[in-house]
Amino acid sequence: MSRKPKILYVVQNLSGGVLTYLTSLCNALKGSYDIVIGYAKDKDSPADVESMFDPSIPMYSMTTFDREGNLLKESAARRELRDIVEKEHPDIIHMHGYKAGMIGRKALDGMGIPMFYTPHGYLYLSETHNLLSRSLYRSNEANLARCDCMTIACSKGEFAETLGFTRNATYVNNGIDVQSIQKVIDAHEPREHPFTVYTVGRINEQKNPVLFNEIARVMNDVHFVWLGDGSWRERLTAPNIEVTGWLSREDSLHRCLDCDVFILTSLWEGLPISLLESMYLRKLCIVNNVVGSRDVITNGENGYVVDSAAAFVNAIHHHKDPQSARMIEAAFRDINEHYTVDAMAREYSQIYQEALAEETA
């Protein structure tokens, strides 16, 4: 029997939507590929993160992987990553996130192994960073795009940004495991609850808890829930906001089912898993007008795309309109047609196989 090709996934932050994305992708690909994961663990990562993956998958916690740009640690991280490559001999390397892409391409360019990079949201798109920082992030992306590495964007919007750096690029929409979600839906016993607006994810700069808090303060008679935790938790000061802390994926889905309207206030995105899941759960989805979110939601067709706290509030007030019910069903259909993990895995596998064929040609 021939050996299965081996993929090394390098991940800068194994938590939130990226964690859900990667566990689903690994489960879908493990029959055709051997998989190895090198990852950074931060305060937002679940303590038992390795137990969320199939036990056949070797996991390397990269202790030198520093998100804050420490040059000494960056050099050590490159050495640590090269050590993993020398030990595991992967046939394919796929890096996820800005820091993973930067360290991986610097460390491994020229080794003759097919490499891929998925940004999951370009940092330079965030308007909360000053102009100098955004310029530096963009410059780094442009310089590293010269490496022998294909960028696989996770949405059409991210792909359009990528083409500003390189033509060695394609895109694969993120997808969700609808079968596992359906099992939760089928087992769910609805609970009585007040009208509830919710979001899911890390409470950090990217997810924009300041805007979420502003919306909650305006709608002070509505219950708001943030499913998750993070370093910006103290920004959620409105008394009508409940912060759940980190929950298991199944418990989080059950809580989502007992909520009514999903909002995503993010400042930038790749293609948000929490949005895809809420669309499948048949929740009205209202998103900030940013790359990634607006690639999935078309305003007035399968949800609302808005630009301000006032516009979020106005859209929430329309949740009982007949038009909103039609949009909810349109969003559900979109998931089944375009955003399943099976479709995502097929497209990734095709890209990987084409790269392997070129190596052996």
What are these regions (language model features)?
Residues 9-22, 26-73, 161-163, 230-232:
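N-terminal strand-loop element at the rim of the active site
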Residues 142-184:
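Donor nucleotide-sugar binding/catalytic pocket of nucleotide-sugar-dependent glycosyltransferases
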Residues 284-287:
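Short hydrophobic beta-strand element within catalytic cores of glycosyltransferases
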Residues 8-10, 190-207, 213-217, 225:
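Conserved donor-binding/catalytic core segment of Leloir-type glycosyltransferases
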Residues 267:
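Aromatic "clamp/platform" in nucleotide-sugar-dependent glycosyltransferases that forms part
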Residues 95-101, 119:
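Short His-centered aromatic/hydrophobic patch
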Residues 298-310, 317-322:
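Conserved acidic donor-binding segment of nucleotide-sugar-dependent glycosyltransferases
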